[in-house]
Amino acid sequence: MKNSKIRILSLSIEHLKNVQHGSFDFQQDVLPAKAFDQSSVIGFYGQNGSGKTTVIQALGLFKQIAMGQPLWTDMEKCINLDSNKATISIKFLIKFDDGKSYHVLYSGTIAKRATYKVGCAFAAEKLSVASEVAGKISGRMTNLFSYELNFDDKPNFTPKARYDSIVKGQEKKIQASVAMRISQEKKTSLLFSPDFFALLKDSEETEMIEIVQAINSYANFNLFTITGVHSGLISMDAVIPLSVKYRHKDATAIGDIPIGQQGPITVNEQIFDLTESVLASMADVLGALVPGLSIEPMIYGRELMNDGSMGVRYELVSVRQDKRLPIRYESEGVRKILSVLNLIIAMYNNDSFCVAIDELDAGVFEVLLGDLLKVIMESGKGQLVFTSHNLRPLEILDKQNIVFTTTNPENRYIHLKNIRPTNNLRDCYIRALNIGGQDEPLATETKFHLIRRALRNSGVKDG
């Protein structure tokens, strides 16, 4: 498998949750040839329920699709009520180590139909590609491979010549039919399913093999999403999901390490060693973000676990001026930073790494948030996508790095227009909220007298 670097260039969402249609570019003013030369930061702002979180969830959904994992168990309920299908389209720049570069557009349509015993499944997928030469696209994007189910749930593959090349012979046609049926039953993508990829690898479609492998590897190792579930676990004092991508003992650890908040926990020695190493790797950055603070494990001893292996009983403590305090007594902001810091470090140092964080500002001091984003913008390498309500980043980031949600479900994401370099984006946003002047309304107007009356009447009802 060739080594590759990947950057997300754009994302389009249709009929997912409360977004009928919304699209945006990740790097508006950056030439494709220079896409890997600097970080890409994009923040989403808007009123509650306007589609900010849907962006993070759409990226998380694509990650599951490209990893060959099943769709969400409640996927049918996430399709907009006014439609029977949802589509996400995501465009990449893929650069291989042999010098070849491509623009690749993946589009997946998920439909709910009465004929699906599983409630919903993929109705269509398409992979389009265009070669990049000297930083420019050479010609239009062409259909690399696609299929669409007809009314009888039978797939129509295009281009037919490529499909015939992949499934030469009756035996492979049967294997392809089985792969399609399995992907429908398991609610997985056909393009990224192990069964279909086994057929693909046995074909002569080298270009398609390399592109599918690159996207699958990117989804597995370099694309991460942090949703409100993480923040909820922290807020409930349940666990701190320590999200990591970390090289440890000749292997790469990927996922969430659960850190107990209710007192000491016992984990096997391998998990403890990994946790200790991750904390040590973050120590300098954490101390720079929160001066005087360090986090370390306090070991209470070792004991035999149920499976017969040796475990370590420990809990995390925060240390300030040689005084130790259980991590559950630290502020929610510190615990939130601890949870995502390893991924932020990975994103800062890896130009093919993307992390999307919902409510990045939750519990975080606004000056610290602004300083962190400024450093990432100036000297980072990867991609950061975040949602926020704190307006401090509007004074730090350029206008092209901020996307605002609208009240129009048919056009959810826009950039503010008529913004000059000397304008304060924060002031312009507040002005647009109050008096308009943009292509779409940014928020539904709230009336003070109605709020006042509702509060008063509710108080009367409650005695």
Residue positions per predicted region:
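Long, charged, glycine-rich C-terminal linkers/tails
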Residues: 73, 292-312
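Short, surface-exposed beta-strand/loop "edge" segments at domain boundaries and coil↔beta transitions
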Residues: 19-20, 96-104, 128-142, 305, ...
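Conserved P-loop NTP-binding catalytic core
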Residues: 42, 56-115
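Short secondary-structure junctions
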Residues: 69, 100-102, 286-296
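Short polybasic amphipathic segments
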Residues: 11, 88-90, 119-132, 312-320, ...
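Switch/communication elements of ASCE P-loop NTPase nucleotide-binding domains
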Residues: 1-69, 73, 308-454, 460
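Short beta-strand micro-motifs enriched in acidic
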Residues: 27, 107-121, 300-305
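Electropositive, glycine-dotted interaction segments
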Residues: 112-290
